[in-house]
């Protein structure tokens, strides 16, 4: 399948499921299950319930998607030192 055929959508994370999967509600109200893209896993980007994310969805199966980007909430302020991995 070529990348041109994928649909780009945005949604909100409702629930975190086992095996790095998430239940997402799209902006149009449709619900689906999504997993994180390799780029997101590689960069250790944490996705929590309530986060706004961008997804790629195949036009052949609209019940599954891949999370490609987590949008940053401007209202959050990080007080103190940045998160460090040990």
UniProtKB/Swiss-Prot annotation:
Places the protein is found: Cytoplasm
One Pfam family in the UniProt entry: eIF-1a
SUPFAM superfamilies with a match to the protein in the record: Nucleic acid-binding proteins
Gene Ontology molecular function: ribosome binding; rRNA binding; translation initiation factor activity
A GO term from the CC aspect: cytosol
Protein keywords: Cytoplasm, Initiation factor, Protein biosynthesis, RNA-binding, rRNA-binding
S1-like domain sequence ranges: 1-72
Domain of life: Bacteria
Subunit structure: Component of the 30S ribosomal translation pre-initiation complex which assembles on the 30S ribosome in the order IF-2 and IF-3, IF-1 and N-formylmethionyl-tRNA(fMet); mRNA recruitment can occur at any time during PIC assembly.
PANTHER family, A to Z: TRANSLATION INITIATION FACTOR IF-1, CHLOROPLASTIC (PTHR33370:SF1)
Family of this protein: Belongs to the IF-1 family.
Main function: One of the essential components for the initiation of protein synthesis. Stabilizes the binding of IF-2 and IF-3 on the 30S subunit to which N-formylmethionyl-tRNA(fMet) subsequently binds. Helps modulate mRNA selection, yielding the 30S pre-initiation complex (PIC). Upon addition of the 50S ribosomal subunit IF-1, IF-2 and IF-3 are released leaving the mature 70S translation initiation complex.
Name of the protein in question: Translation initiation factor IF-1 2
């Amino acid at each position: 399948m070529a990348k041109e055929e994928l649909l780009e959508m945005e949604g909100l994370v409702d629930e975190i499921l086992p095996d790095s999967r998430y239940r997402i509600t799209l902006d149009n109200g449709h619900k689906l299950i999504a997993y994180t893209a390799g780029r997101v896993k590689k960069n250790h980007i944490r996705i929590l319930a309530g986060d706004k994310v961008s997804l790629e969805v195949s036009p052949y199966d609209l019940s599954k998607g891949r999370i490609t980007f987590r949008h940053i909430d401007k209202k959050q302020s990080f007080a103190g030192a940045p998160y460090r991995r040990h």
